Amino acid sequence: ELSGSIIGLKRDKFIVLLIGFFVIALVAVAGRFGIFTLCTLIANIVAFIYFIKLYVSGKDFMLINVLMIIFFSVVTLLILGGFSRKNIGAILSTLITTFLIFALYKISLAYTGDLHYELMDYIAGPNDLENIFLSGVLVGCLGAVMDVSITVNSAVNELVNAAKSITLKQLIKSIREIGHDIMGTMINVLMFSYIGGSLSIVILKIINGYNFQRLIQFDISFEIIRFLVGAIGIVSAVPISACVALLFFRKGMSKNDSVANNSIADVNDSSRRR
């Protein structure tokens, strides 16, 4: 005979309520862009579940990781911004930066040795611990890198279209100023997100007598690595995005430079005549 007992309250109504508030607020504030944002969220969640099932079925995890990063970048930026030069530039900037982070991570491990992956909170098994952690690091910083990439490419696009006589030197100076503004905020956002994720376990272990040095060495070292790798990605995304954007808009810049040079020449000629 099958029997059961009540062991707790069913709290999924609260989650459904929050989802409802989120959808209503997003559509009310952003309109059509909010609907596109919801489409990207749904597509990325479905793709993430599919990629996890591929890994469970025995597929190569690094190949899955590469496909996942490409899919997230392409789908998110194309659905939200459409097929345009600035979005293609943002996609290329994101992928170049992400795979640069991957290469730097591998080079660092080759010189310093492997991390103690057995100290992670949840271990899926004895194999692929390094790849699982690396995948989490790359996916974790992907959003920040995408944000920086689309910001820089959009800024270059707007500057070239709005200021017809802007020179390459002026454009690079503007990109540098934009990069300074977004780097500081994005790095702090990344830090706060990782602090929020590990705050409960940190407080719990401090209450139970863990000292701060032991906590950093054995418990939050992985969070620190995630933050540092993501911060390097944000910093790297600014010059990479700038180079990609300048290459994509170089035809416009050459015309702009010639216009600026012609304007300077006209001014010089008029001054000589005077």
Regions found by a protein language model. Give the residues of each.
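Transmembrane alpha-helical segments that form the functional core of multipass membrane systems
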Residues: 32-120, 130-134
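Short helical (or helix-break) motifs at transmembrane helix termini and adjacent helical loops
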Residues: 143-159
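Hydrophobic alpha-helical transmembrane segments of membrane transport and translocation systems
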Residues: 28-29, 195, 201-274
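Juxtamembrane helix-boundary/capping and inter-helix hinge elements in multi-pass membrane proteins
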Residues: 159-169
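Short juxtamembrane and helix-loop transition motifs at transmembrane-helix boundaries
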Residues: 2-7, 21-33, 52-60, 158
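Loop-to-transmembrane-helix entry motif
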Residues: 10-13, 58, 175-189, 228-231
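Pore- and gate-forming transmembrane helices of large, multi-pass membrane proteins
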Residues: 147, 168-202
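Hydrophobic transmembrane alpha-helical segments of multi-pass transport and channel proteins
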Residues: 99, 141-148, 182-187, 223-243
